[in-house]
Amino acid sequence: MPYLFTSESVSEGHPDKVADQISDALIDNFLAFDAQSKVACETLVTTGQVVLAGEVKSKAYLDVQEIARGVIRKIGYTKSEYMFEAHSCGVLSAIHEQSGDINQGVERKKKEEQGAGDQGMMFGYATNETEDYMPLALNLAHKLLEELAALRRENKQIKYLRPDAKSQVTLEYDDNNRPVRIDAIVVSTQHDDFAADEKMLAKIKKDVINILIPRVKAKYPKYAHLFNNKIKYHVNPTGKFVIGGPHGDTGLTGRKIIVDTYGGKGAHGGGAFSGKDPSKVDRSAAYATRHIAKNLVAAGLCDEVLVQVSYAIGVAQPTSINVVTYGTAKVDLTDGQIAEKIMKMPCFDMRPYFIEQRLKLRNPMYSETAAYGHMGRKNEVVEKTFTSPDGKSIKRKVELFTWEKLDAVKEVKKVFGLK
């Protein structure tokens, strides 16, 4: 029987994402000047105020206020009427030194014996329903907001947009679990107060349907067939949305973990990513399990897979690895037998040190993850510039989204006897 499935996304100007981006900008700057930095940084944003709190062990000294303001400026909070503005907002730092009790559980005489930074379970998921092995509903929700942000920055076709926005996409699937059409789209976007309420809302809905949607279809033609004249559009369904961003809602690091991952598909262990250096397995192991899942599906082992790993704090070896193929495996093995083989593959060594080395996680690569999802993104090398409080600048070439590489497909095929 056909069924519906829904995923949501939020824009870079959503208050929780503002917090995520500030936290990850701090991570990047610490790692740029001291690759062995240990950092856990939480951010709170509200009307005219940013609060930074967390624990750090690093040789680097940063101007955290300027880093936070730079992120806010880049997002687009640059007008006083937003009641949260890069130049004038207060920035309070309560960042202090990391506990020695925690650090002793991570550091070892032998790097290879580095313990997990915490206990917990992490999940990686992949499906072949899209070219980047991500759930389609989430992909579409991200694309809508990426294009909406592009329209805001261009300030040509739509001139009233403000940074805060959310989207939601509902897909209809057939009996074979294949997406066949978009059933509903929700877009809520912050905007200037430019006309009477009813006239303003009618204009926004018209622009979303006639400008944003065609732009998404043109830029992503592989999705175009899913759009149809029966889509139910809900554009700013609560009414006008002038007051938004951190002035409308307080934002906190780590509150959009489903947007960050798989949009409700698969599973989530509960640990957020942003603001954590890679010694925290909440982040590094979630990336590593995504890397495993994507390579398994790309190799043709299965159509869909969920990989779980778990750790005890201070212990290098995982306490468990679990694989679920949802009955789509192409080999005559149980999911447990597949997991056993994966555990023995050097290219999927799940000890924290080896994850860091394999995925190059000690590089300043995290700011780009903090909006529009950590998974399914483009693996590429970029040059980034970082400036210390004394004015010293360094340039770094950084490989982004290393966990999206399909560099283990050949080995998976060999181990599982796939052609």
Task: Mark where each language-model region is.
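N-terminal, positively charged regions that mediate nucleic acid binding
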Residues: 1-40, 155, 409, 415
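Glycine-rich, mobile lid/loop segments that gate access to catalytic sites or pores
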Residues: 6, 48, 66, 73-243, ...
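Conserved phosphate/anionic-ligand binding catalytic regions in large, soluble enzymes, centered on
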Residues: 8-10, 14-19, 115-130, 242-267, ...
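Alpha-helical support elements that line or immediately flank enzyme active sites
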Residues: 12-31, 129-148, 276-300
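A short glycine-rich, hydrophobically flanked beta-strand micro-motif that places a catalytic Asp/Glu
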Residues: 37-41, 165-171, 231-235, 301-312
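Short, charge-patterned binding micro-sites
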Residues: 39-58, 313-317
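Internal helix-turn-beta structural module
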Residues: 46, 304, 311-419
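Glycine-rich anion/phosphate-binding loop at the beta-strand->alpha-helix junction
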Residues: 196-297
